[in-house]
């Protein structure tokens, strides 16, 4: 065995030669969490229903809401209807509330939606209802998949060792490792902020400790991971009164990417013949103290250009959370999905 980084030591008492090999001579080990794709569902169906009845001296009301669905493998089709015994003027007695077909691609964490659904929300734009097509990532339905900024514990060991992760003095993760370079995924159960400490202890009792501030939040994507949604269709208005009120055609692209452990950047762009919006999104973990979420937007409504900005500062303490939010809109700013005569509040603070 030869090499500039290999050390030899003669032990006369034991009549042995001790050989010290660096971790690079051992096989690298990646201790990833086991992720199992959901099993295909057998053919089946479901029925959800809700009834409301009221009676007074002047009127009697009976309303019923029902959702009927069928599913198989990774797809599902559902339809919801509303019945009013005594509809008001302009309302239908039988109303189709929504019809939606969903197809999952579990190995890619993707979902296709065709039918009535809602748009992706951001801190400046409210969601709106539409009928059309949506295709994008679907992380939240998979509890075994860590999509946020969990710390990946990476390093090397020349002896069998144990790696411990402490946050605010509490041991949250423990893993035994073999000699060599290692990479550990700490799992999906941690969502905290504070002082993190990684302790590596080998079988001889030698310890190495690394400390650093950390803010873990589901709003911060894992480094290199993309979150996106592409949608197009027609805006839906008065869905609780008319089941066919589809109007302006639109297209929308929503995209976010984890560029660093504490930084996620993205944009949200929508286009229609009357209104176009573009917003830039920035989510930042401020050391171990708080989460800063900002958005900057511009709109074009029939040639009138408007601007908007929002900023929120929040902190999760485990059992409770604290947050501040402020928004500012110019008079010309218009959102897709709003009626022409709807106006934004110039400034709001929460």
What is each stretch, according to the model?
Residues 1-226, 235, 279-350:
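Outer-membrane beta-barrel channel domains
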Residues 242-246, 270, 301:
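Alpha-helix capping and helix-loop boundary segments enriched in small/acidic/polar residues
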């Amino acid at each position: 065995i030869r090499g500039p980084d290999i050390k030899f030591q003669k032990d006369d008492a034991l009549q042995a030669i001790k050989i010290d090999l660096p971790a690079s001579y051992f096989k690298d080990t990646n201790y990833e969490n086991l992720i199992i794709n959901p099993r295909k569902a057998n053919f089946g169906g479901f029925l959800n229903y809700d009834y409301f009845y009221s009676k007074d001296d002047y009127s009697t009301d009976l309303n019923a809401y029902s959702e009927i669905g069928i599913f198989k493998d990774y797809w599902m089709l559902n339809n919801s209807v509303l019945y009013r015994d005594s509809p008001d003027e302009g309302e239908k007695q039988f109303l189709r509330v929504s019809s939606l077909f969903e197809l999952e691609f579990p190995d890619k964490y993707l979902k296709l939606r065709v039918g009535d659904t809602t748009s992706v929300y951001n801190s400046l734009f409210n969601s709106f209802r539409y009928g059309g097509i949506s295709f994008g990532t679907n992380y939240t339905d998979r509890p075994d998949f860590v999509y946020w900024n969990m710390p990946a514990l990476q390093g090397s060991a020349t002896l069998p060792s144990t790696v411990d992760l402490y946050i605010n003095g509490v041991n949250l993760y423990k893993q035994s490792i073999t000699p060599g370079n290692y990479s550990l995924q700490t799992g999906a159960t941690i969502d905290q902020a504070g002082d993190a400490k990684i302790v590596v202890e080998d079988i001889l009792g030698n310890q190495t400790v690394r400390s650093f501030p950390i803010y873990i939040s589901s709003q911060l994507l894992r480094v290199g991971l993309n979150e996106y949604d592409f949608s197009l269709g027609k805006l839906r208005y008065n869905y609780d009164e008319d089941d066919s009120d589809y109007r302006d055609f639109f297209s929308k692209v929503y995209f976010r990417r984890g560029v660093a452990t504490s930084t996620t950047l993205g944009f949200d762009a929508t286009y229609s013949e009357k209104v176009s919006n573009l917003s830039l999104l920035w989510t930042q973990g401020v050391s171990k103290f708080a989460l800063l979420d900002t958005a900057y937007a511009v709109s074009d409504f029939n040639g009138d250009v408007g601007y908007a900005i929002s900023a929120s500062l929040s902190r999760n303490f485990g059992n409770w959370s604290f947050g501040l939010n402020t928004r500012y809109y110019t008079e010309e700013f218009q959102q897709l999905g709003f009626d022409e005569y709807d106006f934004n509040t110039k400034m709001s603070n929460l």
